[in-house]
UniProtKB/Swiss-Prot annotation:
FMN binds at residues 185, 193. This is Riboflavin kinase. Its cofactor is Mg(2+). Keywords: Flavoprotein, FMN, Kinase, Magnesium, Metal-binding, Nucleotide-binding, Transferase. Its EC number is 2.7.1.161. Catalyzes the CTP-dependent phosphorylation of riboflavin (vitamin B2) to form flavin mononucleotide (FMN). Mg(2+) binds at residues 128, 130. The keyword Metal-binding applies. Residues 1-89 are annotated as: Unknown. GO terms for biological process: FMN biosynthetic process; riboflavin biosynthetic process.
C-alpha cells in the first residue's frame, strides 16, 4: 500500500505536472520525517512505480507517473464521497474536441441502438459529443464511474460478438443525454463521449475548444450493473 502522504507532498511541490529537482533535506522539510525515513519512502514510491526518480548532483529529479496520479485521483474520489455523501448532482467541465468515435460506433449498430432507445428512452443522434475534461474534472471521472449506471448488454449478431458497456444519464445545456463507456475502451482518462437525441454541437452551437458543463444526475439504483 503506497504512503499517500509522501505522494501528496510531491504533488503539492509540482511533481504531478513536471520533473522537479529536490534534495532529500529539502523534501524532509515538507514531510517532517527523518532523512532516513524520507529516503526510504521515496525508494518505496519508486519501487511501486508511482514516481520516476533519477539521482543527480545536488539532489534528485522526480516526476509522478500516471499510476501515481491515478492513486491520488482515487484518494480524491474517496474524500469526495466522505465529505459530500448527499451530493445529488456531479458537474464535470471540459472542452469540446474531436474524439475517438467509440461512442459513435455504438450508436450506429442496431443491437446497441435498440437498447439505447429502450433504456435511455430516446433515439440517439448518430454521432457523439466528445469532451476532454479539465484537470479538476478529470479527477472526478472515477466518481462518475462509481455512480449507478445503465447497463448496455453485449450480444452476438450471428457474425461477430459485440461487447457491453455502461451509460450514465447526464444533462448538457438542459438537454437529456448520456455518457457512454464501453467495457473495452482505449479512452484516455480525461475523455468522455456523450450521446443525445439531437446533435449537441448544433443545438448548443458548440465548436472544438468550446467549454461545456456536463451534469451527472445520480440514479437510485443501477440497471443491471
Amino acid at each position: 500500500m503506497p504512503d499517500i502522504k509522501y505522494l501528496k507532498k510531491l504533488a503539492l511541490i509540482g511533481a504531478i505536472n513536471k520533473i522537479i529537482k529536490v534534495s532529500s533535506s529539502e523534501f524532509q522539510k515538507h514531510t517532517g520525517a527523518s532523512s532516513k525515513t524520507t529516503a526510504r519512502k521515496l525508494k518505496q514510491l519508486e519501487d511501486e512505480r508511482l514516481i520516476e526518480r533519477k539521482i543527480v548532483p545536488g539532489g534528485q529529479l522526480i516526476k509522478m507517473t500516471d499510476k501515481g496520479i491515478e492513486v491520488l485521483k482515487n484518494e480524491y474520489v474517496d474524500y469526495s464521497r466522505i465529505f459530500s455523501p448527499d451530493l445529488d448532482i456531479l458537474e464535470l467541465e471540459g472542452k469540446v474536441l474531436k474524439g475517438l468515435g467509440e461512442g459513435q460506433y455504438y450508436v450506429n449498430i442496431p443491437g446497441y441502438r435498440k437498447q439505447f432507445e429502450e433504456k435511455l428512452h430516446f433515439v440517439p443522434f448518430p454521432g457523439t459529443l466528445n469532451v476532454q475534461l479539465s484537470e479538476s474534472s478529470s479527477s472526478l471521472r472515477n466518481l462518475l464511474l462509481e455512480t449507478p449506471a445503465i447497463r448496455v448488454e453485449g450480444f452476438n449478431d450471428g457474425e461477430r460478438t459485440f461487447g457491453g458497456g455502461k451509460c450514465y444519464p447526464v444533462v448538457v445545456g438542459s438537454i437529456e443525454a448520456a455518457v457512454v463507456v464501453p467495457e473495452r475502451t482505449h479512452y484516455p482518462s480525461d475523455l468522455i463521449e456523450i450521446i443525445a437525441p439531437i446533435k449537441l454541437r448544433d443545438a448548443l452551437k458548440l465548436k472544438d475548444g468550446d467549454r461545456v458543463v456536463v451534469q451527472l444526475k445520480k440514479q437510485g439504483t443501477e440497471n443491471q450493473k
